[in-house]
């Protein structure tokens, strides 16, 4: 928030979209948010703010995460904006992945331009409401920015974006419908169509929570190509409900003809990526679950680049080495860097209960 406040003070137009549920849980009464919303050149809006008179709409969340700058640069991925995801290197509780797109001369088909149009569509929704800030004359955010700049000057050095990025053959934005309502699974369907194009598909996702229709798609995909998922092991995953559901659904998942790498790497995986063949890489916010398919706003960026694909396969290979590979026939192989950590008895008992309790609400996990 300090960086956004400082940008506005320099005359930059700043617009911030915040998920309404996240704002209720984490930003209620936030002096920093009030200072930001009250500042000249700053606007803050909430997507589907919590209304206890409309409890049926609480579950529609804004789950995508991105930053747009000057119509030529965007950063997009699965990383939430809090300390669990933005701590110093090696201290974050979750492993995540983002992709930066630099387009100094964007045309109307450019992914950055597509993301601008997407932002405008969400910003103008009836269910997106402005935050009215209180101007108390406070300067806490500007003071925080000055302290950050003094303490970490290397983070503020100019960046040669052309030199820091890799030329690619194409980038395309995929997204869900934007309204706060039950959604047709447009993004899931698009991902399935992409996966159908490759003979070797590798998916990294925090959890696998599928509907009957999603299982049908996985069976069709698993029957005609190599399809593997890299996901959290129940010993290392941070989402208790997702891990409990996996235990209850594991046999059904493997029955789709897919391989599963159960990763135990010291951190909980929060990355969302799909690699199709040796060219396509898809990165964004979409979890392989029903909430991402049917309820939330989601974004995925499709990158056509053998070089990026190879880089990502190399990174994911490290996670595979720290995994327990489970095959469709139930046989298992431990990776070269896999270190077994026993599941505590208390956690095992909790999973045993939760795997049954979550069944009626799997679509909300």
Predicted regions and their residues:
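Charged, low-complexity intrinsically disordered terminal segments
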Residues: 1-43, 49-63, 69-365
């Amino acid at each position: 928030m300090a960086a956004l406040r400082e940008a506005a003070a320099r005359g930059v137009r700043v617009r911030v979209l915040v998920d309404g549920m996240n704002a209720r849980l984490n930003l209620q009464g936030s002096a920093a948010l009030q200072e930001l919303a009250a500042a000249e050149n700053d606007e803050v809006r909430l997507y589907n703010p919590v209304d206890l008179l409309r409890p049926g709409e609480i579950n529609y969340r804004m789950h995508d995460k991105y930053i747009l700058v000057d119509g030529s640069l965007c950063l997009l991925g699965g990383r939430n904006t809090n300390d669990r995801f933005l701590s110093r290197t090696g201290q974050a509780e979750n492993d995540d992945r983002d992709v930066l797109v630099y387009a100094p001369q964007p045309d109307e088909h450019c992914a950055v331009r597509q993301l601008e149009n997407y932002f405008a569509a969400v910003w103008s929704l009836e269910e997106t409401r402005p935050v009215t800030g209180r101007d108390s004359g406070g300067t806490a955010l500007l003071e925080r920015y000055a302290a950050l700049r003094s303490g970490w000057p290397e983070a503020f050095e100019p960046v040669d974006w052309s030199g820091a990025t890799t030329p690619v053959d194409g980038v395309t934005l995929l997204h869900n419908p934007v309204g706060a309502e039950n959604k047709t699974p447009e993004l899931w369907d698009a991902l399935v169509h992409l996966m159908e194009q490759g003979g070797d598909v590798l998916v990294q996702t925090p959890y696998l929570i599928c509907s009957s229709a999603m299982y049908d798609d996985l069976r069709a995909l698993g029957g005609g190509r190599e399809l593997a998922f890299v996901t959290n092991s129940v010993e290392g995953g941070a989402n208790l409900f997702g891990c409990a559901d996996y235990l209850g659904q594991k046999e059904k998942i493997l029955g789709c003809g897919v391989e599963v790498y159960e990763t135990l790497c010291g951190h909980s995986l929060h990355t969302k990526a799909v690699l199709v063949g040796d060219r396509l890489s898809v990165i964004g916010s979409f979890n392989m679950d029903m909430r991402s398919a049917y309820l939330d706003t989601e974004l995925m960026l499709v990158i056509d680049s053998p070089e990026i694909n190879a880089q990502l396969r190399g990174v994911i290979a490290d996670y595979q080495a720290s995994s327990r590979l489970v095959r469709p026939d139930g046989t298992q192989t431990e990776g070269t860097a896999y270190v077994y950590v026993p599941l505590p008895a208390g956690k095992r008992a909790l999973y045993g209960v939760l795997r049954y309790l979550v069944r009626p609400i799997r679509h909300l996990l």
